[in-house]
Amino acid sequence: MDAVQQQTNSTSNIDSAKCQKLKRFVIVGLLITIGILSWHFYEYFHSKPLPKTPDDVLTLSKNLYAEETEVSPYLYKVNLQGKTTSGAHDDRAPRNLFELHQDLLARDANSTTALLMRLFDNYELDVAVQEHPTPEHVQEQYDFLRAVMGTRVMKLTMRFLVHKDIVSVEYDDQLRLLQELWFTPYSRGRGIVGSSSFEHVFMAEIRDQKVLGLHNWLYFADQEQRGNVDYKGWLNHKEMGKHNQMVLSVRYTFHNINKPVNGFFVGISPELDMALYTACFLATAKEEPCHIQLGHASATIVSHEWKWNGMRLIGTVYPDSS
């Protein structure tokens, strides 16, 4: 009898253990299911649909600015200081124009801002020096573009370009459009392939001791930190309405070369910068000004094309708020 009782107890213990294991399995499965359903409910109720596709860039720019749900967390302060003129040679701004949250930039490695700034050391400054893009550089280009393509700002822009029959609805076609438009290397003279739309607009170039481009506030801030830019004062600025956001024209020196006037947007995201420049260049008639509205600030985006191997690329594009 004792042997039978022990066997019965052993069987009962095994069944109890199996039951407990099954319960844990069911509970874990239920928790995972609830988590997945909760995420889908969150997405459904909290992700708003994109606004109706506009017919003109002016309306598009208003919609794009509305998608900038928050100001750049990386921009701590804008020090405008003294007003100047393009013909002046004195320094009316002893402090840097921008102060950044460097620690936050270091932590947010996958943000469009961090991915943009990762590209800043991939290029030769002098357009007379041949560019030699490495596989790593090309990968960093695609990492940045894919991140930009994932934003609501660029999704809305691409839908506008599809509406204008400029690009297809296919993701790969849209990615290719941005890659070719912004990152195709071309020559600005002497047959030396030492430039690109991206390098000119989002960074800066030097040709025959003249500063070209530099129409992105993040590159300006980066070069200030490195001691390559010396801000001399502002010529004109229009506030957009959100903290630290404006259309700004400035005077400065870059590598000790004077730049009497230069314009860029301040405090906006890389995707909004790229979206505005892309839409204006592709959807506006050749050499025609492109009128935009970002909050309280109205401006005109000026663009000039560069023909290269049968392609229509960006020679320059920048905002003018005067």
From Swiss-Prot:
GO biological process, one term: regulation of translation
Catalytic activity: a ribonucleotidyl-ribonucleotide-RNA = a 3'-end 2',3'-cyclophospho-ribonucleotide-RNA + a 5'-end dephospho-ribonucleoside-RNA
Gene Ontology MF annotations: lyase activity; metal ion binding; RNA binding; RNA endonuclease activity
Protein name, as recorded: Uridylate-specific endoribonuclease EndoU
PANTHER family recorded: ENDORIBONUCLEASE-RELATED, PLACENTAL PROTEIN 11-RELATED
Quaternary structure (record): Monomer.
Topology relative to the membrane: Single-pass membrane protein
Chief site of localization: membrane
Protein's cellular compartments: Membrane
Positions annotated as active site in the UniProt record: 200, 215, 259
Tissues with expression: Predominantly expressed in head.
Bilayer-spanning residue ranges: 25-45
Effect of deleting the gene: RNAi-mediated knockdown is late pupal lethal. Conditional RNAi-mediated knockdown in pan-neuronal tissues or specifically in cholinergic neurons results in significant lifespan reduction with some individuals failing to eclose. Individuals that do survive to adulthood appear immature bearing unexpanded wings, soft cuticle, unretracted ptilinum, dimpled dorsal thorax, and misoriented scutellar bristles. Surviving adults also showed sever locomotor defects. Conditional RNAi-mediated knockdown in motor neurons results in some locomotor defects but only mild developmental or lifespan effects.
Gene that this polypeptide is encoded by: EndoU
Function: Endoribonuclease that cleaves single-stranded RNAs at uridylates and releases products that have 2'-3'-cyclic phosphate termini. Preferentially cleaves single stranded RNA at poly-U sites with CU, UC and AU sites cleaved less efficiently. May target mRNAs encoding proteins involved in lipid metabolism to regulate their expression. Regulates levels of TBPH protein, but not mRNA, by an as yet unknown mechanism. Important for neuronal development or function.
CC terms in the record's Gene Ontology section: membrane
Protein family: Belongs to the ENDOU family.
Residue stretches making up the EndoU domain: 53-322
Cofactor(s) named in the record: Mn(2+)
Enzyme Commission number(s): 3.1.-.-, 4.6.1.-
Keywords recorded for this protein, A-Z: Endonuclease, Hydrolase, Lyase, Manganese, Membrane, Metal-binding, Nuclease, RNA-binding, Transmembrane, Transmembrane helix
